[in-house]
Amino acid sequence: MSAILNVEGITKRFGGLQALTKVTFDLPEGQILGLIGPNGAGKTTLFNVLNGIYSPDEGRVHFRGKDVTGHKPYHLSRMGLARTHQIVRPLNGLTVRENVTAGACFGRENQKLGRAVQIADEVLEFIGLAERAEQLASSLNVAQKKRLEMARALASRPYLLLLDEVLAGLNSSEIDGMIAIVRKIRDQGVTIIMIEHVMKAVMNISDRIIVLDYGQQIAEGTPQQVAADTRVIEAYLGDPKLAERLMKEE
């Protein structure tokens, strides 16, 4: 299985703060990679490097075989890399359909408006928001806005999707619904990296997991391997038996 993303020695500093230190990993196509760690561990900073908001101070990022280190977010979107944000900011004065249409217009396939609207309707059906298409984005609740954020990213037709805490603020039934959507996206061939604090979800949906702590990559492996790693237990999970329980829960 070929790698869609190669991350080599990524280091990022903000003045005297070193937010990331030589983070390195390869991501095979078609997998879900979970990215976990305490608050302030560098997870969102890594996303910001991967999608071009920040340029790394050291290291390289290769996406689909091309060096994209320091490329701008709009360029990476055209190449097929999309992301969601932890704090969703829809275009509140536009309808749900118009929000998703914008994603299609500025994505990988550079769609004309008419086709972009068709793509928006297809994605809204897929994501479960078709009946809300004519509503203003401002009228949606938190769970619906999370889905809209994901729909807007999907409309860009990404090869790689970065999901930043899409489960945050959701209740248990909403979490189950969102997990089902993430699996559907993966089943359509989209590779996913997801930052998440809902351990039950990330342990059961991820093919592999990377753990960051103070910007250091302290573990990488299958959920079972990561759950048994003493460094992860000390830095994040706390309870040695917690991970075992999470792995058994579906």
Tell me what each language-model feature is.
Residues 2-250:
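Glycine-rich phosphate-binding loops of nucleotide-dependent enzymes
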